[in-house]
Amino acid sequence: MFTLERRVEQSKSWLALSPIMAIVLTILSGIIIFSVLDKDPWMSLYTFFIQPLTTGFGVTELIVKATPLILIGVGLSIGFKANVWNIGAEGQFTMGAIAGGGTALFLNTQESFLVLPAVLLMGILGGVVWGMIPAFLKTKFNANEILTSLMLSYVALLILSYLVHGPWRDPGGYNFPESEIFSDFAMLPILLEGTRLNLGTGFALLSVLIIYILLSRTVSVSYTHLTLPTNA
């Protein structure tokens, strides 16, 4: 008879192999899906994985699009280390963008070096406040944080859709759902001329290093409930 037992320690080999297995399974799943759709799976995988790396501009665009994902992953890793599940990163990122973008639009005519710090600060606060909602519901009403944080992501996307289709839509944007272009004072400095690669990538890499050092020196502890000691 077989029994399942919890590991005393995490397997280091499985920790190393898990990302590799995830990539392999993703590729195999893609091959199966494209084959079922009667599409060339190898050409599709080439377009997805290789083609963006064949030009310098493609590489920089890949880095630009990966930068917010890196920051999101770093933020989530802290909660996961404490066994706190947060499935609402997309919504928190979106609300941070709304708060920061709204600040940039409000200060669009201001020519001051203080505009960028204000935009960054409001972006952080927007994400924090949105993340506090499922935390409050969990502590006050014991609501499942996985469900509430996930559902709030859709709410955030609807708010963003309303803003870019309504009050924030650029009058000169040919009716596209987008805001006005932010002023240069609200934008991070460009690192490579002719691309969108900006200082945000440096911030993301620095945050990875800092959080790695923090988590590698931190013990994960979680509590499910508190009890009074019983007398012997």
Tell me what each language-model feature is:
Residues 31-52, 167-178:
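Interfacial/capping segments of alpha-helical transmembrane domains
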Residues 17-34:
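N-terminal signal-anchor transmembrane alpha helix
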Residues 224-229:
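Conserved small/polar residues in nucleotide/adenosyl-binding loops
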Residues 1-21:
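Transmembrane alpha-helical segments of polytopic membrane transport and secretion proteins
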Residues 149-221:
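Transmembrane helix-bundle core of multi-pass membrane transporters
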Residues 32-37, 47-107, 120, 124-132, ...:
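Single transmembrane alpha-helix segments in multi-pass membrane proteins
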Residues 14-18, 56-63, 88, 190-200:
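Interfacial loop-to-helix junctions that mark the boundaries of transmembrane helices
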